[in-house]
């Protein structure tokens, strides 16, 4: 899986990142911890406000669903008790979807997850662990399992999946499956096969993410 990523690309926010995978491109910004509105405040932990903006037009129910899935992935990663009565705003702007938006959202969701994690790191938010997410498709005629499928491969897919895994011990150990979002027809054997392949590819991606973080943050450190 070939990706490009950069952190600290935006001014006037606490953290930001850009994540590109094939034809899908996402920019994410993080602001916080900041003072929340009264209705958003949580007495003992950090509150999250997550916004996903589409590449074209205004946000619809589709983006609200993406926001809910993104929240489910990011919440376990953040050490929220460190920031009681505070708010963190996470905004993902999709620049290029790289897929048919009327039918699919897995590529966008996967890139939003990876971009949000990098932006949280850039913002200095305390995290419990790392995460990496990949899109997967099972092709209709051959039943081949394709990681990071193209828009053309998605159109001939039998099922599509977004996998997000939580990593600990420097990205070497999988702690938890944060998300497995599936749509389409598949059997149990195919599910186990894609999880096995997905774990391997997520491991490679999290290693790449660690390198990106190191390359971007090391120059800022005062030795």
From Swiss-Prot:
Could you confirm whether the keyword Secreted appears in this record?
no
- Recorded source organism is Saccharomyces cerevisiae (strain ATCC 204508 / S288c) (Baker's yeast)
* GO annotation, biological process: exonucleolytic trimming to generate mature 3'-end of 5.8S rRNA from tricistronic rRNA transcript (SSU-rRNA, 5.8S rRNA, LSU-rRNA); nuclear mRNA surveillance; nuclear polyadenylation-dependent mRNA catabolic process; nuclear polyadenylation-dependent rRNA catabolic process; poly(A)-dependent snoRNA 3'-end processing; RNA catabolic process; RNA processing; rRNA catabolic process
Record's family? Belongs to the RNase PH family.
The name on file for this protein is Exosome complex component RRP46
- Encoding gene, per UniProt annotation: RRP46
Q: Which UniProt keywords apply?
A: Cytoplasm, Exosome, Nucleus, RNA-binding, rRNA processing
Its localization reads: Cytoplasm; Nucleus, Nucleolus
InterPro entries the UniProt entry points to: ExoRNase_PH_dom1, ExoRNase_PH_dom2, ExoRNase_PH_dom2_sf, PNPase/RNase_PH_dom_sf, Ribosomal_Su5_D2-typ_SF, RNase_PH
Primary residence: cytoplasm
Q: Does the keyword Lipoprotein apply?
A: no
* Pfam families membership: RNase_PH, RNase_PH_C
User: Listed GO cellular component terms?
Assistant: cytoplasmic exosome (RNase complex); exosome (RNase complex); nuclear exosome (RNase complex); nucleolus; nucleus
Picking any one GO molecular function of the record gives:
RNA binding
Q: How does it assemble?
A: Component of the RNA exosome complex. Specifically part of the catalytically inactive RNA exosome core complex (Exo-9) which may associate with the catalytic subunits RRP6 and DIS3 in cytoplasmic- and nuclear-specific RNA exosome complex forms. Exo-9 is formed by a hexameric base ring of RNase PH domain-containing subunits and a cap ring consisting of CSL4, RRP4 and RRP40.
Which function does this protein serve? Non-catalytic component of the RNA exosome complex which has 3'->5' exoribonuclease activity and participates in a multitude of cellular RNA processing and degradation events. In the nucleus, the RNA exosome complex is involved in proper maturation of stable RNA species such as rRNA, snRNA and snoRNA, in the elimination of RNA processing by-products and non-coding 'pervasive' transcripts, such as antisense RNA species and cryptic unstable transcripts (CUTs), and of mRNAs with processing defects, thereby limiting or excluding their export to the cytoplasm.
State the SUPFAM superfamilies in the record. Answer: Ribonuclease PH domain 2-like (SSF55666), Ribosomal protein S5 domain 2-like (SSF54211)
Share any extra remarks. Answer: Present with 10800 molecules/cell in log phase SD medium.
